[in-house]
Structures are given as structure tokens and as C-alpha cells.
Amino acid sequence: MPAAWPPRTVIRKSSGLRTLESALYRAGLGPVAGVDEVGRGACAGPLVVAACVLGPNRLESLAALDDSKKLNENERERLFPLIRRYALAYHVVFIPSQEVDRRGVHVANIEGMRRAVAGLSLRPGYVLSDGFRVPGLPMPSLPVVGGDAAAACIAAASVLAKVSRDRLMVAMEDEHPGYGFAEHKGYSTRAHSAALARLGPSSQHRYSFINVRRLVMDGEPEEHGEVGCGKMLVDMPVDGVLHEGQLSR
């Protein structure tokens, strides 16, 4: 029986994105799935979680893979169809804002990771998650701090989640005009705060986030910066899922 944890390979940042996965494959623990999320800090829109399995060999077509936050929009859009083409399996899960409110963002994140892994058409032998331990998986797993910059399968999942969520937020602009979702993607900006104060929260906003909840409670928007949307105040379920072959391009 293979070991539950990867061999104690020394992984240096300069080693490249495939080093950890390669060690797992050599130990007989493949296929290796990476899982990552996008949208934890947004106060509107879904939390999106992706799982992705890449083959054991490095592909030149995916050489530009990196943490999706380090890639610009054009780079992510170029990689998105390539990942879908060359991945052995992938699965993208959308956790709606109502479920984030009901469960709390961390619990919703972990549940989303479980769903994403469970939805893969190829059962992984090992799962690498970005930063968080994912209890309840039926296979061994390892949280990797900064995983989207340390493992190719996590980086691929990061790009799938980011592009899927960004496209959804752009489409959401037509359904909820005036909030600027196409620009800020549901994250907190001055323009978003001004729209919230003017229009009030939409059905896509997370009422458990303090800056949204305060508008409901007393009509006063919270002052905040550009990157977060305030802390959660409380710990509902329709689940959207992107399977292989869905979402154009």
C-alpha cells in the first residue's frame, strides 16, 4: 500500500511547478488533483472552487501556468481553453452567495473543495489543496501554502476558477445593472461602495459581510479599502457546476 503522505522530497521554490506532483506520481500516489478557490473576499457573487488533474508529464502548452493572481486577464483567458483541453479531468463548482451566508465563507470553501474533487471524472489518488486542509476527502491530501505558485495542478485549478468567476460576474452586470460587477467582480472598491449606498444590496450580495449588512440594518456603508469586503458576521443551497466541455472558449 502506498504511503499516505508524499516522500520527504526537498521542494525549493526554484524547482518548478511540477516537482511536488512528480514526487507523488513516482511514489505511486497519482493521479494528482489540485484544488483552489476564488472569491473568498468578495462581498457579492459566488465562491468558485475548481479541481484539476494534470498528467505526470510537463506540457509546453501550459508552461505559463502560475498563480492566477500573478497572471493578467489576457494570460488567464489564453490558458483557460488549454487547461480544459489538456487536463485529464476538471470540475468547477459555484457556491452561491446565499450558501456562503448560511455556512460561513470558510465552511463553504471547504465544502466547495469536496464537491469539486467529487465531481472529477477521474478519481485522484492524491489531492493538493491551496492553503487549507480539506477534511472528509476519500483519498489522502496535503494543504500547500501558496500552492497556486507551487504546484501546476493547483495553478491550473486557480485559473479555471478565476476565469469562470470573472465571466460570470461580467454576465451578472446585465442582470444587476449599476453595481459595476463587470469591473470589480464583486470585490470592495469605492465605486462598489457608492453603488451599494445608492442602490442597496442585490440578491447576489453576501448579507453576512458587515459592509453589506450595515446597509440593511441602518443604511450606513462601511468605510473600507480596495481589497476586502469586511469580516463575516454569521456563520442557503443552489449549486452551479461547470463540467468538462461546458463554458465556451
From Swiss-Prot:
What catalytic activity does the UniProt entry give for this protein? Answer: Endonucleolytic cleavage to 5'-phosphomonoester
Subcellular compartments = Cytoplasm
Q: How is the cofactor bound?
A: Manganese or magnesium. Binds 1 divalent metal ion per monomer in the absence of substrate. May bind a second metal ion after substrate binding.
Question: Which cofactor names does the annotation list?
Answer: Mn(2+); Mg(2+)
What's in the keyword line of the UniProt record?
Cytoplasm, Endonuclease, Hydrolase, Manganese, Metal-binding, Nuclease
Q: Name one GO cellular component term.
A: ribonuclease H2 complex
Q: Which residues form the RNase H type-2 domain?
A: 30-221
Alphabetical GO biological process terms: DNA replication, removal of RNA primer; mismatch repair
Pfam families for this protein: RNase_HII (PF01351)
Family of the protein in this entry: Belongs to the RNase HII family.
Main role?
Answer: Endonuclease that specifically degrades the RNA of RNA-DNA hybrids.
PANTHER family referenced in this protein's UniProt entry, alphabetically: RIBONUCLEASE H2 SUBUNIT A (PTHR10954), RIBONUCLEASE HII (PTHR10954:SF18)
Protein name (database record): Ribonuclease HII
**Species whose genome carries this gene:** Mycolicibacterium vanbaalenii (strain DSM 7251 / JCM 13017 / BCRC 16820 / KCTC 9966 / NRRL B-24157 / PYR-1)
Taxonomic classification: Bacteria, Bacillati, Actinomycetota, Actinomycetes, Mycobacteriales
Its gene? rnhB
